[in-house]
A protein has these predicted regions:
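S-adenosylmethionine
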Residues: 1-466
């Protein structure tokens, strides 16, 4: 028999039960519940376009996930991250072991295969454990039982040849849906687009914004000081709340790119500043730490509670307002306004690898329209001569450059207040010809890609002239 799997032949035969092959009663196999949950959640992401964060919330997530113990929850998160970061590469490897396509309605089977392959290709899970649990999973599910032999053969073939096959596939496959790759290429050109998609395959580091002495904290935590003053850690191996400085409120978690928009407001000590769509509060903390009188506005009570807890830990204060920005009338104007608008979040792919699979071009158009409405509302809160910074974590110009250009075309009472690359450390190479901020996961490259990059962000600084 050839190395490729004869699909029809595998359908008609089932392997005999042998210890360790996954043919034992499914309920007796440790780890099977976690793999079932991973396959179920993978289906929810790629088939139903359900955001992963909600599915894996420890308190309110998918019941199959929340029923697991903390260790298995962490495993499920790791499996899903690997399966989504490398979705098309895994799919290509699976296809290479089949002599014909799987049936059109074999979604559950594919999810089982992807979950197993992600473990032995990209995680520190023994080949035999991943394969045996996948076989047990397939044999216990009536929808996939007849494919048990195929699952066993495909996965064992992949595991045997992974050292040779995986590098070739990774070098020739873009692990992103076509619509996303095409929009990146149109916006940034093929070279930068490929660099962004390559960065998506690597887990993002842990970035911290510190209140004082970033160099000292970088040394104390075993991290690196980034050009903008962010302290960066790679795989710290310690839960965030247990890291030095957390309990004392010395720092907060914030991607390096996310820390830039608040700084674009300039010196805010003693100024009245509105932070709109403020939760969970990283930018509010920056502004308060810089001496601003901050009004933090958000429409979500749950997110504002989290913001309040974060500020309390940091020993910072702000006026916290729950309101719909479209109808909020504070009765006064602000010296400066920061609007970090809800968006497609395509710039956060390293942290949220589901985004490219749960969003679509239609979603981007709808979100851009919603952001324009928020920008119109925010503009009415700025005093004459005051600054307005509009930002989001999208890589798409429809939500950034083109949106701001349209706003300025229709609003003669506002003008662009161009950002200078020399305003503060870390901006070099991140400011475009119009004076807007644009970051991508391909920025700040270093030899070890684990230390490279940042979230994709856009920010424009505007000034009210009338």
């Amino acid at each position: 028999m050839t190395e490729r799997v004869a699909t029809e032949r595998r359908r008609k035969t089932r392997p005999k039960a042998k210890p360790g092959t996954g043919a034992e009663p499914a309920a007796e196999m440790p780890g099977l519940a976690a793999r079932r949950a991973a396959a179920r959640l993978l289906a929810a992401v790629v088939d139903a376009r359900t955001p992963l964060d909600g599915l894996t919330d420890s308190e309110h997530g998918n019941p199959q996930f929340t029923a697991l113990d903390p260790r298995d929850r962490a495993l499920v998160r790791a499996i899903l991250a690997a399966a989504l970061r490398h979705r098309l590469s895994i799919g290509a490897l699976i296809d290479s072991r089949l002599d014909r396509p799987l049936p059109a309605r074999a979604g559950t089977l594919l999810h089982i295969l992807h979950v197993a392959a992600a473990q032995f290709l990209f995680l520190d899970v023994p080949d035999s454990a991943a394969v045996n649990l996948a076989v047990a999973h397939a044999s216990a599910d009536p929808r996939t039982r007849r494919f048990t032999g195929l699952v066993n053969a495909v996965l064992r073939a992949l595991a045997t040849r992974k050292e040779r096959a995986l590098p070739k596939v990774l070098a020739t496959t873009r692990d992103a849906p076509d619509w996303f790759a095409e929009r990146l290429i149109a916006a940034y050109g093929p070279e930068t687009a490929d660099a962004i998609m390559a960065a998506h395959r690597i887990e993002a580091p842990l970035d911290l914004t510190v209140r004082t002495d970033p160099g000292g904290w970088a040394q104390r935590l075993g991290g690196r000081l980034m050009p903008n003053g962010t302290v960066r850690l790679v795989q710290p191996g310690t839960p965030v709340p247990e890291l030095a400085g957390y309990a004392e409120g010395a720092w907060w978690v914030q991607d390096a790119a996310a820390s830039l928009p608040a700084r674009l407001l300039g010196a805010v000590d003693g100024c009245d500043v509105a932070d709109l769509c403020a939760a969970p509060g990283g930018k509010t903390a920056q502004l308060a730490n810089a001496g601003a009188r901050v009004t933090a506005v958000d429409g979500s009570a749950n997110r504002l509670r989290r913001l309040a807890v974060n500020l309390e830990r940091l020993g910072l204060s702000a006026e916290i307002v729950r309101a719909d920005l479209a109808s909020w009338r504070p009765g006064r104007l602000f010296d400066a306004v920061l609007l970090d608008a809800p968006c497609s979040a395509t710039g956060t792919l390293r942290r949220h690898p589901d985004v490219a699979w749960t969003k679509s071009p239609a979603d981007i158009a709808k979100l851009a329209a919603a952001q324009r409405r928020l920008l119109d509302a925010a503009s009415g809160l700025v005093r004459p001569g005051g600054r307005l910074v509009f930002s989001n974590c999208s890589l798409d110009p429809e939500e950034g450059e083109r949106l701001v250009a349209g706003f300025l075309d229709e609003r003669p009472d506002f003008c662009r207040d161009p950002i200078a690359p020399t305003e503060f450390d870390g901006l070099d190479g991140l400011v475009d010809a119009c004076g807007d901020l644009r970051t991508t996961p391909a920025d700040w490259p270093v030899d070890d890609p684990r230390w490279s990059g940042m979230d994709g962000f856009f920010a424009a600084r505007l000034r009210r002239t009338g």
